[in-house]
Structure formats: C-alpha cells, structure tokens
Amino acid sequence: MNRLTKYAVCALAGLAATHVSLAATVRVSGDNTWKVFHDGELIAEAADWQAPTVTEFDVDKNGRALIAIYVHDAEPGGAGVGGMLADIILDDGTVIPTAEDEPGWVCDVGDPIADRDDDWETVAFDDSAWIPLTFYDQFGLGVWAGGTAVMTARFGDPEVEAFWSWCMPNNETDEVYFHYRIGSLAVESEGKLATAWGALKDSR
C-alpha cells in the first residue's frame, strides 16, 4: 500500500468514525391544532389529536436542526386542557421524546401564531429565555388515553414513550410554542450550559 492509498483509507475510516445523523423523523400530536417547523419551514400541520403527524426531515452536515412546534388549545382557559406530545427519531435509532429526562425541550407562551412576527420558528431565534416543559401523562395514560389505539397505529414503530406536555399549567395558557435543537441544547433560564449532541448521546 503506497502512502497516498494509505492516506485515503485512513481518511475514509475517519469519516465513518465521525458519522453524524443526517436524517430524522418527528412525530407530533397536539390538542387541539398544531404546526411543525424544521429550520423555519412548515413541514406538518393538523387539527385532530388522534391523528398525529409523522414527518421526515434532514439535518445539516454537522448534525444540527431546529424543530419548532406551535399548539393552539381551542377551549380557552379552564374550559379545557391543552397538550403536546412529540418525539424525534434519528437515523441511528436514537429517540428524543418529550420527557423530563430530555432537557433540550423548551417552551414559551404568547400571541396566536397569526399575530406573531418575531421569527420564533427559525434557527437564529434566541430561545435562551424559554422555560422547561410541564409534563403530564405518558402516552397511553390519563386524559388522552382514549385515543391510544388509533394513535399507535398512526405513529408506527418505535413504541411511543413520550409524555403529554405543555408550557405552564395547561388549563391557563392556550397559545404555546416549543423548541428542540438537535445538535445542541438551548441555554435555559436557570443557567444550564449548551450541550453538544455528541455528549448527550454519550450519556445514554
């Protein structure tokens, strides 16, 4: 093996060792209506919490992407409760559900989406002041348990382990926004430092 061939083999081996996820799927349900954005682009929307959306998307060459979700609760205030359930599945099989042990999920409340013009759904938006989610029942339990069978069929594999969530009490807020940054975690108001996706995966 000459020096040039040896270099090429080593370079290819290095690329294989540093593979980053370049494809992913996001599965979402919201009560009552929702929109899903990937790096600022609308990729899914629906209005039936028992009919979740399952959408493929790409991440950039560094393995980074922003998933931004808006959910509207149609019953104002205490007349009803809102909920959002989601997970992100990377091409290596890693699953990132809405759950307490996935600190990258953050949220905010605000005006209806039609009245919001601050580019909240884009990668450049500063979400450092957003707060952790409030979690309720795990999928298949609680208020939304009645739709489990239908939703499971639509979700497909793998099994959903996410929890229904909201931003602050779900009988008080009706216009809610969510972020998850693949590749890094948002800086939270408590002062948590940004964490590289590689380090997050290594901790699993």
Task: Locate each region found by the language model.
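Exposed beta-strand and adjacent loop surfaces of beta-rich binding modules
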Residues: 23, 33-35, 85
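Short, surface-exposed beta-strand/strand-loop-strand elements in extracellular ectodomains
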Residues: 33-43
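Surface-exposed, short loops/turns at beta-strand junctions within beta-sandwich domains
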Residues: 59-63
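Bacterial N-terminal signal peptides that target proteins for export
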Residues: 1-11
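Sec/Tat signal peptide C-region and signal peptidase I cleavage site
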Residues: 17-23
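Short strand-edge motifs at loop-to-beta-strand transitions and within beta-strands
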Residues: 53-57
